[in-house]
Amino acid sequence: MTTPDAFRDAEYIADVSGISYGNVANLTEQDANVVPRENERMRKLQLAAKVAFIDRLLRDLDILIYCELSALYYMDCSVILFAIRAIVQLIFFTPKAPPFDPTRNQPFIGAIFVSNIFCMIFHNFFTHPEASEATRGYLHGGLLIDFIGQKAPIPLFRLFLLDFLVLILDLVMLGLIVERVKTTGQTSTTSTEILRVQDHDSEERGVHRTRPESRSSVVGAELDETDGHITRANAGVGEQAEHTQLLADPSEDGHTPGAKNSHPLDAFSSGEAVIMNLGLFDVIRDQWKYSTTAPPARTSSYIPSDQTAAFLRARFGLQVGPDGRVQRIQS
């Protein structure tokens, strides 16, 4: 993930986002209503950068798995085993262009374990790569091309080790796909804070109602005195936090904090961002539970136009039902 291509993807996302260095940290108190929108933009930018890094890692792992399959083919010279794994890799794990984005509605667990366990059993009990003197001790095989493999005999432990490595890489790619689906499916969390409009009463009390406040704020006769204490307490806490920030993270000029010159993608560029916390057993359990759960009934919102409905009815005697399925008109 330290290749220039991954950072080029993230830099492109940063360029099109329109977020410059320090434009959020330099906002004043009068621009407090702009901060939530800027925070939402930064959050979307970071999610887009995370998806870009996951896509790059998926492509790199896909190439690595094909290289491992090629190495295994040169050791066992079995087109059947190579084709089984290559087809599974192509269908389930090879990244594809939109709209064929990866989803979790596929039998990943069955495809991974069935294909890899079958190849392991075949290598341990049925395949014994040997070569005769006619081939000078080298393995030959292939249906279309007579590839020359390695020199026989091939240790079974090496075959089993490569089989296990392919299995681990498949599970890692499954974890990345699950994380990508979760990242792209995230929605903006609804804040419990509301934005209130400034009125005359708040203006007389010296309270800024445009600042976000909690829904559980107490409304009563003692509001004036309580708001006064809260305002003074918040002012003291704000001054203390600002003082601590100035002492802890001074900038070069000594007037503004260094955080104002930051960018949402600094963590990705510096390598400090965590793409995902991978636990193989957790990934297997979550995907298995997701696969065994019955999907909810889908209601199609597709409504054909009058011209399309008339054409289907006149030409083929078909109609689109309420569930979106094409049905034959019963005469």
UniProtKB/Swiss-Prot annotation:
Q: Where are the transmembrane segments?
A: 63-83, 107-127, 159-179
Task: State the Gene Ontology BP annotations.
Answer: SREBP signaling pathway
Instruction: Give glycosylation sites per the record.
Output: N26
Q: Where is this region: Disordered?
A: 197-225
Q: Is DNA-binding one of the keywords UniProt gives this record?
A: no
Q: Which InterPro entries match?
A: Dsc4-like, DUF1746
- Composition bias of kind Basic and acidic residues appears in 197-214
Could you tell me which pathway this protein works in? Protein modification; protein ubiquitination
Q: Which GO terms describe its cellular component?
A: Dsc E3 ubiquitin ligase complex; endoplasmic reticulum membrane
Key word Glycoprotein present in the record?
yes
Which key words are in the record?
Answer: Endoplasmic reticulum, Glycoprotein, Membrane, Transmembrane, Transmembrane helix, Ubl conjugation pathway
> Effect of gene disruption?
Impairs growth on solid media under hypoxia and leads to triazole susceptibility. Impairs virulence in a murine model of invasive pulmonary aspergillosis (IPA).
Location(s) in or outside the cell: Endoplasmic reticulum membrane
Q: How does it sit in the membrane?
A: Multi-pass membrane protein
Q: What is its main location?
A: endoplasmic reticulum
Q: How does it assemble?
A: Component of the DSC E3 ubiquitin ligase complex composed of dscA, dscB, dscC and dscD.
List the PANTHER family hit by this protein, alphabetically. Answer: DSC E3 UBIQUITIN LIGASE COMPLEX SUBUNIT 4 (PTHR39405:SF1)
Its biological purpose = Component of the DSC E3 ubiquitin ligase complex which is required for the srbA transcriptional activator proteolytic cleavage to release the soluble transcription factor from the membrane in low oxygen or sterol conditions. Required for growth during hypoxia and triazole drug susceptibility, as well as for virulence in a murine model of invasive pulmonary aspergillosis (IPA).
Q: What is this protein called?
A: DSC E3 ubiquitin ligase complex subunit D
Which gene underlies this protein? dscD
